[in-house]
């Protein structure tokens, strides 16, 4: 009888597990690998901020799961129930579609995370997010829609409100989103003769005393100077209190009139975990031991954003980054293989090679193996490293072509509202809840 390994989640962690298992059991048909995800593709999220800015085509940073994982049975479906007692998963292609049951011997929980709005009034309703391809394409269309609207509005105050874009969160996602968005909106303004440069405003709101707290203070200070020098208004030690769609209220009592709030200020584990019989810590993440196995649940592993994994080098929780997720995936796959073959599992341990953050317009910061870089060379490193990590030769070539064209031609300002509606996304002027993965 075949040994059934089922992976729930097709992000960095889930695909890393499946890919490693395929290599470990390449010539062993007795091991069946199944991956369930609500999408049939994975997104290379480090490049996601370049999609709303028009630097990259959306489909060029995704890779089809079926093409990447040829030995894995990929099921595009939403998981409805995970019954750890019966070792079964109930899922369906959609909420209204017929359900099917998948049984497992080994279960891998790679469910990822969703955006954390911290219960702030109006934020979940009005804020946009940057966690999925749909988020990125919707943001692109939303921004162009605001320019088109502002170009027709004779009221200067109304124009400024329409063309003020607030990004919440000064981590990697927030800084890169603000930098790319700033480059895009500054360049787009030249196509709208009724608008003035002073009408456009990009603000980055961060509760900490410095942006990019994951890198050194020197690189953080460089990033701050670069963003401010390019027109991004960086508000440090500032918290957002609420959003009503017409303004963003700050905790100090001030308000920023705007119709665009992009939220990158935190994540929480996938709420599907609440219905699964596994131990969870105070933050809602699945508790795991040093081998990434769930204590007291035979054959169940958890990793990535949904798992409470301790970084052995620092003693702190592992950050929700692709580097850690991929390395965890390899360890989980090897420990499943060890369990099947009667071997001993190995503990997870990883020291990240470095951190990189793009600041737009051919500048970045990088901290690699103790060395620190900033400016053009760091930007070149950022692009080179992520291009190498992008799955698939075809995608690499397409991204290289996009970047080459971006050197010589202006970015696209086509308004795709009709296409957004046709795909079933939220309307461009209405924010939507993030997808749960």
Predicted regions and their residues:
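FAD-site-proximal beta/loop scaffold in flavoenzymes
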Residues: 125-155, 246-249, 255-327
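Short glycine-rich anion-binding loops that position phosphate/pyrophosphate groups of nucleotides
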Residues: 13, 112-115, 178, 267-269
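C-terminal, flexible cofactor-proximal segment of oxidoreductases
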Residues: 334-437
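A Rossmann-like FAD-binding core segment of flavoenzymes
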Residues: 32, 72-89, 182-290, 294-296, ...
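Short hydrophobic core segments
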Residues: 6-8, 102-112, 132, 240, ...
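Internal hydrophobic alpha-helix adjacent to the cofactor/substrate pocket in enzyme cavities
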Residues: 18, 183-186, 323-350
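Beta1-alpha1 glycine-rich phosphate/pyrophosphate-binding loop at the start
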Residues: 1-81, 165, 175-215, 262, ...
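FAD-binding core/adjacent interface of flavoenzyme oxidoreductases
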Residues: 1-2, 73-168, 184, 262
């Amino acid at each position: 009888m075949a040994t059934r390994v089922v992976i729930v989640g097709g992000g960095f962690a889930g695909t890393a597990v499946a890919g490693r298992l395929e290599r470990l059991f390449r010539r062993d048909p007795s091991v069946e690998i199944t991956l369930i995800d609500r999408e049939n593709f994975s997104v290379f999220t480090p490049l996601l901020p370049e999609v709303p800015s028009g630097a990259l085509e959306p489909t060029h940073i995704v890779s089809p799961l079926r093409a990447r994982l040829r030995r894995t049975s990929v099921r595009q479906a939403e998981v409805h129930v995970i019954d750890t007692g019966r070792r079964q998963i109930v899922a369906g292609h959609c909420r209204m579609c017929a359900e099917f049951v998948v049984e497992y011997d080994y279960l891998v929980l790679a469910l990822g995370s969703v955006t954390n709005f911290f219960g702030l009034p109006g934020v979940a309703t009005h804020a946009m997010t940057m966690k999925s391809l749909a988020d990125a394409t919707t943001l692109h269309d939303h921004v162009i829609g605001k320019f088109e609207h502002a170009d027709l509005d004779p009221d200067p105050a109304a124009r400024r409100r329409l063309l003020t874009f607030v990004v919440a969160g000064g981590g990697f996602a927030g800084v890169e989103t603000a930098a790319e968005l700033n480059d895009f909106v500054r360049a787009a303004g030249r196509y709208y003769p009724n608008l003035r440069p002073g009408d456009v405003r990009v603000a980055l709101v961060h509760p900490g005393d410095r942006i990019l707290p994951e890198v050194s203070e020197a690189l953080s200070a460089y990033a701050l100077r670069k963003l401010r020098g390019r027109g991004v208004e960086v508000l440090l030690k500032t918290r957002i209190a609420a959003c009503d769609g017409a303004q963003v209220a700050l905790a100090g009592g001030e308000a920023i009139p705007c119709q665009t709030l992009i939220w990158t200020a935190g994540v929480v584990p996938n709420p599907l975990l609440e219905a699964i019989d596994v131990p969870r810590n105070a933050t809602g993440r699945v508790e795991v031991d040093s081998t990434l196995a769930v204590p007291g649940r035979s054959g169940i592993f958890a990793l990535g954003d949904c798992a409470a994994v301790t970084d052995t080098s620092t003693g702190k929780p592992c950050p929700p980054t692709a580097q850690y997720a991929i390395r965890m995936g390899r360890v989980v796959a090897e420990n499943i293989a060890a369990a099947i073959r009667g071997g001993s599992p190995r503990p997870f341990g990883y020291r990240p090679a470095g951190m990189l953050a793009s600041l737009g317009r051919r500048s970045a910061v990088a901290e690699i193996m103790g060395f620190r870089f900033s400016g053009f060379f760091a930007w070149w490193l950022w692009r080179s490293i992520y291009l190498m990590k992008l799955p698939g030769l075809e995608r690499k070539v397409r991204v290289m072509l996009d970047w080459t064209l971006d050197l010589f031609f202006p970015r696209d300002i086509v308004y795709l509202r009709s296409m957004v509606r046709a795909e079933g996304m939220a309307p461009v002027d209405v924010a939507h809840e993030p997808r749960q993965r």
